[in-house]
Regions:
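N-terminal "arm"/small-domain region of PLP-dependent enzymes with the aminotransferase-like
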Residues: 1-50, 65
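PLP-dependent aminotransferase class I/II
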Residues: 34, 202-279, 283-286
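Phosphate-binding glycine-rich loop
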Residues: 56-95, 113
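PLP-dependent aminotransferase-like
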Residues: 89-146
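Active-site pre-lysine segment of PLP-dependent enzymes
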Residues: 111, 128-139, 152-175, 179-215
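Short beta-strands and strand-loop turn motifs
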Residues: 114, 118-121, 143-150, 175-179, ...
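PLP-dependent enzyme catalytic core of the Aspartate aminotransferase-like
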Residues: 160, 307, 312, 316-341
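Conserved PLP-binding catalytic core of the aspartate aminotransferase-like
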Residues: 267-268, 272-307, 323-325
Length: 341
C-alpha cells in the first residue's frame, strides 16, 4: 500500500446537492457521552455565572493521579489541537519535522506559528519512516512529531522502534508523541509513558478526551512532560481558559471505566469486521488500531461521496473513514462493494 501526500481537499461540484447521510470525516465517537458524564457537566451549569480557575489545577491533578505522574507534569488545553498549539508557541520558532500524510491540523498549526514544516513521506506500508525522520533533523529543527497510532493510516510503530528513535534524537530537540487514539491500542502495544518520560526529558506525550471518551465538543486535551520543557508549555496556557465542566466530565469518565471500555471494545470489533468485509471486496485497508480505517484509492473517496458518505479524502482517491456505527459501516460496504470489479 502506498500512501501519498495529503492536500487540502476541495468539495467537487459533481456532488453539489448530494445529501450527507453519514459524516465519517472527523474520527468522532459514534456514542454520545455517558448519562453520568452528561449529569456531571449539567451540574456545573448552575455556577456558569462564575469564572473558572484562573489557571487550571483540578483537571491536571485528576489526570496526573490517573497516570501516576505529578500534577505539574500535566498541561491541559482546548483539545489536543489546543495543547499542540501551546507547544508550538512555547518553542518560539524553528522547523517541525513530521510524516506526511498526517493529522491535517499540524500543517495548519505550523503555519499559524510561523514554523516551516519538513514533511517526510510514509513508507510503502503506511508506517512513519523513522530513519528518514531522524535524517531530517538538523540544527534548525525545533520539534519532531510522531503519531501513535498514526493518522490517517491507523498503523502503530513498534514500541522498541519508538524507544530507539527517542534515543537517537538529540536531547535539545523536543519530540511530540501524539497519542490521540491511544485508548484504542491493543494492550500489548501500549507504551510505558512514565518510563519514557523518565529517560527522555525532551519528550511530550499528547492525548485527548475527544476520541475514545466521546467529548469532542468539550475540547479537553492534555500533554505530559518533564522539567523545563513542560514548564514552557504551561506558560502558554490561557487564563480562565478551562471551564469547570472539563474537570467534572473527566472525573465522571474515569468513574465509568467499565462502560467506556465496553464502548471501545465495540468500536474495535466494528472496525475489524468492516476492514475484513472491505478486503473481501478488494479494498486493502491496513490494520488499524484507531477508530478509523484508511481506504486506499483510486476512486474510494468519489464512491463514498456519491453514496452520501462524507469521508476525509486524499488526492489519490483514498479516504479515511470513522468506524463504530454498524449502519454507517454497512453503507460504506455497499458503496464500495463493486469498486474493484
Amino acid at each position: 500500500m502506498t500512501v501519498r501526500l495529503a492536500e487540502p481537499s476541495v468539495p467537487s461540484r459533481r456532488f453539489h446537492g448530494t445529501p450527507t447521510l453519514f459524516d465519517l470525516s472527523l474520527s468522532e465517537n459514534p456514542f454520545p457521552p455517558l448519562p453520568s458524564v452528561v449529569a456531571a457537566v449539567r451540574d456545573t451549569l448552575a455556577a456558569a455565572n462564575r469564572y473558572p480557575e484562573f489557571l487550571p489545577e483540578r483537571l491536571p491533578r485528576l489526570i496526573a493521579e490517573r497516570l501516576g505522574v505529578l500534577p505539574d507534569e500535566v498541561v491541559v488545553g482546548a483539545g489536543a489541537t489546543g495543547v499542540a498549539m501551546q507547544i508550538l508557541r512555547a518553542l518560539g520558532g524553528g522547523e517541525i519535522v513530521s510524516s506526511t500524510p498526517t493529522f491535517d491540523g499540524y500543517p495548519i498549526m505550523a503555519e499559524m506559528a510561523g514554523m516551516p514544516l519538513v514533511s517526510v513521506p510514509l513508507d510503502a506500508a503506511g508506517q512513519q519512516d523513522l530513519a528518514a525522520l531522524r535524517r531530517a533533523v538538523h540544527r534548525r529543527t525545533a520539534l519532531v512529531v510522531l503519531c501513535r497510532p498514526h493518522n490517517p493510516t491507523g498503523t502503530v510503530l513498534d514500541a522498541a522502534a519508538v524507544r530507539g528513535f527517542l534515543a537517537a534524537i538529540p536531547r535539545r530537540v523536543p519530540v511530540l508523541l501524539d497519542e490521540a487514539y491511544a485508548e484504542f491500542l491493543d494492550p500489548a502495544d501500549r507504551l510505558d509513558v512514565d518510563g519514557l518520560l523518565r529517560r527522555h526529558a525532551n519528550l511530550l506525550v499528547l492525548r485527548t478526551f475527544s476520541k475514545a471518551y466521546g467529548l469532542a465538543g468539550l475540547r479537553i486535551g492534555y500533554c505530559v512532560g518533564r522539567g523545563e520543557l513542560i514548564a514552557r508549555v504551561r506558560g502558554q496556557q490561557l487564563p480562565f481558559g478551562t471551564p469547570a465542566a472539563a474537570a467534572a466530565a473527566v472525573r465522571a469518565c474515569y468513574a465509568a471505566d467499565d462502560e467506556l471500555r465496553a464502548r471501545v471494545g465495540h468500536i474495535r470489533r466494528e472496525r475489524e469486521a468492516l476492514r475484513m468485509s472491505l478486503r473481501a471486496c478488494g479494498i486493502d485497508a491496513p490494520v488499524s488500531q484507531a477508530n478509523f480505517l484508511y481506504l486506499p484509492g483510486p476512486g474510494v473517496a468519489t464512491a463514498l461521496r456519491r453514496a452520501g458518505i462524507k469521508a476525509k479524502p486524499y488526492p489519490d482517491g483514498s479516504a479515511r473513514i470513522t468506524v463504530g456505527d454498524p449502519t454507517a459501516g454497512l453503507a460504506v460496504h455497499t458503496a464500495l462493494a463493486g469498486l474493484r470489479g
